[in-house]
Amino acid sequence: MQTGVYSAQKKDGTVYYRANITYQTKHISLGSFSSEEDAHSAYLEACNLLENEAVTLFNIHSQIRHLSFDKAVCLLNFRDNHLYFHNPIYLRKGYFSYFLSDDMELKFDIDDLFYYAGHRIQKRQGHLFVSDYGMQYSILSRYGIKPYAVTGRDYLFFNGDTHDFRYSNILNIN
């Protein structure tokens, strides 16, 4: 077995491969793969992300092929800020970014960090929500905005960025 890889078996007997890495005494799962080579490649990509300071959020796409974008963001945040979150969160000065996808960055105040660290944001038909104890809550509800509210009429984004959910950027009109 190659470094960072171990085999496992599904209930139907199919063999698959798990990749993991240990960094600063933290054991991190990198995912499941159908081949040992893919799992080892994911391990090598993770090593590169954690060791190479030249890799940033701006050039990360050229560095990953086997790792998911979410996992790569988690690893970069752990390397740069020494905090590991299971969700794709990257800490900034005074706020944090939550990457819903590789082209959708949501910005939040640092006050909301531990809420979103424990709740995965999902998007369905343009609506952003989190699941909490079986219920789905719009992320706008944290700002007192009703589910039926309309942007521009019931609430505004001061800087025009509809992905910037910092409290100073949202004006709740109704």
Provide a role label for each language-model segment.
Residues F33-E36:
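Conserved aromatic
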Residues E53-F85:
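Intrinsically disordered, low-complexity charged/polar segments
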Residues M1-G31, F78-N174:
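Short, Arg/Lys-rich segments that mark the N-terminal edge of DNA/RNA- and chromatin-recognition modules
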Residues A19, A39-C47:
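An aromatic-rich alpha-helical recognition segment common to small helix-rich domains
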